[in-house]
Amino acid sequence: MVQGGLDAAIAAVTESGQPYATETRTIDGVDFVVFSNAPDNLRELYRQGLQHADRVFFVYQDERFTYQEAWEEAARVGNQLKHAGIKSGDRVGIALRNYPEWIFAFMGITSIGAVAVAMNAWWSGEEMVYGIEDSGLKLLFADEERIEGLRPYDDKLNIQTIAVRCQPEGYIPWDQFVENGSRLMPADPVPTDTNATILYTSGSTAHPKGVLSSHRAILNALMCWECGGAIGAYMFPQAAAAPTPLYLPATILTVPLFHVTGLVVQFLQSFKPGRKLVAMYKWDADEALGIIERERITSFNGVPTMAWELVQSSAFEKYDLSGLRSAGGGGAAMAPEHARQIDNKLGKGSAGTGWGMTETQGLATGIGGEAFLQRPRSCGRAVPPLVKVKVIDKEGRDLPADETGELCIWGVMNFREYWNQPEATRSTLVDGWVHTGDIGHMDQEGYVFITDREKDMVIRGGENIGCQEVEAVLYDHPAVVEVAVFGVPDERLGETLATVICVNPDEPVSEDELKAFALDRLAKFKVPDHFWIRTDRLPKIASEKIFKRGLRDEAIELLARTT
């Protein structure tokens, strides 16, 4: 389909009077395209779930909650928060595993206009204290692990904490907190530009930034994904007229709810279609396969390695996955061979990926089907009709197609500010554009290719080396499961390249073989000087991206011992 056909479809789907009609609004001094019919606030989104009131909404192990039950639990939370003195704009923290109470707490907090602070449940006690103090929490929901981590700081914090799934002395248990709460949802006014969430960046830096976003930003992001489906149906009516699916929509909650993928893409995107959300205690590919069969999962979204782990599992053939219609993820590039195998094993056209950030509600680009198989290294095109993507040089000037620079994202879904960090906000958010720090280019058709991070560039003897370029080559080796490439200090060259590689234990491979493989595909100076090969998976940060900083620190320590 030529670009003209896409433009015509966007115009038809978004014209005045249509469900996805758009208009221009000035927000914080910037003119944005917004959906005319977007819900006013997240409470109205939750109300949409009542159209499927008796349908199962959330599953955790042997616990099941309908949309009606979730609405009523959220109402109890909201009413009791008001009783505790929480007002619009107050920050309330959630520091839990992906328990049902996480969902109910978030719904209750945001339904009364308070700000839900999604605390990183993987933080240490000291890091938790940083988040609590930085955000200025008035109240905290925490489970046993988080409460124990905070105990050494009890005297310092003096914060009211609601204990979830535990009853430690001196804390109010969840059941007691909500016991007398009305099941009628509060009706407090929550204007669309009210602040809704603070999500902390993944924690790969010493001091994570709190990303503040409004109800409007989140709701427009959700509608943009919906609208993309409507545009596709307009362009390809035969595909849209396909037989009704065998099963109701259902997905797996594969990542923590404190991460934008878990919160927005998986949780909040479930209300409109009445999708079932099945939580796991922790990610495990074999367990996920069992859930896909048992719960009739229809879509799967996580980081790219998760879909790859599914199709590589020795148990893959044992399960009935016929209900699964799509599988993919974002947050990292997918190796071409991984994309092909996912598509072959899960059904033609099912594989896909996308790109987004906490600062953009996870929304920016998307790609799937045949387009993805043709361009597996691309993260797609800007999602219409709200998103724009551009590439700029170091002076901030726009670059033409196929030239490499910093990628920037524009749209109403962008965050409002970094909490308590005005300088970081000013440098990242400029005239409605988020300056991502991702390095890449767009081709002539608008497909985005991320080649590196600004901070992930290694300069070896004056030569710039993009780590993702080297990783992509190593991923093409059939024995390679995961790769991390990074720079380590070198007295002569300034930096040299190092890599830690997880390989398939059933396909042993030597350092010399991998070096030769890379040398056939890369300039010599781009081939890593240091290799560490292992069969254990590489460590991850909360967003499920590989924890490169930790691996680099370990590598530097090992090299210091041997020199």
Regions found by a protein language model. Give the residues of each.
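ANL superfamily adenylate-forming
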Residues: 23, 145-192, 219, 555, ...
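Conserved AMP-binding/adenylate-forming core of the ANL superfamily
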Residues: 34-38, 54-99, 103-107, 124-129
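AMP-binding/adenylate-forming catalytic core of the ANL superfamily
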Residues: 123, 129, 140, 300, ...
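Conserved AMP-binding/adenylation subdomain of ANL enzymes
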Residues: 219-253, 258-298, 313
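Gly/Ser/Thr-rich phosphate-binding loop
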Residues: 272-273, 294-302, 311-374, 388
